[in-house]
Amino acid sequence: MKNLQNESFIIRCLKAAASPSGVCRYGKTFSWLQVTFLFMFLTACLMVPFTISFMKMDRFNVQSFMPSAMQKVNDRFADQLQGFQIRNGKLTGGKSSDRIEDGQNLLAVDMEHEFKTSGENGRLKVTGYDNAIIFQSEHLIITDQNGTGFSVRYAKMDAKLKNPNTHDVESFINEWWLAQYKPMIMMMACTVIFMIQFFLIAVLAGGMWITKLSNMISIASFQEAASIAICASALPAFAAAAVGMVHFDLITVLMIHSCGVTLMISFTFRYLAKTRRYKGELHSGGKYDKSAVI
């Protein structure tokens, strides 16, 4: 054990991640501080492809979570926006301020702020309407009957709405929404990745620690169980990150990582079941006494 601990931290990490036997042999050589660092490093690796992919995005499909409101956009409403322009984050110009009402649905250009809203951003509502898209002087209001509603600032750019059609209006909304809420989405996604990684490691470490009570495997402490779980997740994390860098899909990345960790832990558990610890070292052989140690 002392000889293993004398090796550098990087070398121990690489050897521990290389194979199930390496995971078992080097699992006890890491301190809690090192275990925490490894956990954070591997979690960051999983976040890298998402961050890079998301930074390249210039618009987000708002219709995916506000379908009813976005489906109301039509060419008639697009014609109302003809001649308007965005300058320094403000809507100016234009000749028409008509509204299009259809039951509880509203499409309007409201330069006078006639329509009232209630609720906090994210759950915003326009009084009297279920679905609404309202262009005001400094921001866009979009609410959906599913309870979702946002106030979206116009991007700090110069843009002229010249002969817009339905697709153009949808593209503008998608672009403006992402420009304002990109940090929020990134934070939420990174939090999801962190929680999944933490839950997975905690369950695996706890499961291995519990098996100690039945003498199925030789685990000296919960720290060692946590270290083994984290080291076993290293190769799957690198593989998932590599796939994500080529073509990012959050679900695919998480599935590759989760399935890889499960397989690696299975092989590690099998290796531990075939070995026993004697004087701090892993040996093949019997289950209970020293006579079986090779």
PLM regions: where:
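Short, highly charged, low-complexity non-transmembrane loops/tails of multi-pass membrane proteins
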Residues: 275-294
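General structural signal for secondary-structure boundaries
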Residues: 11, 27-32, 44, 146-155, ...
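Long, solvent-exposed extracytoplasmic domains/loops
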Residues: 61-175
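Internal alpha-helical transmembrane segments
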Residues: 1-69, 242
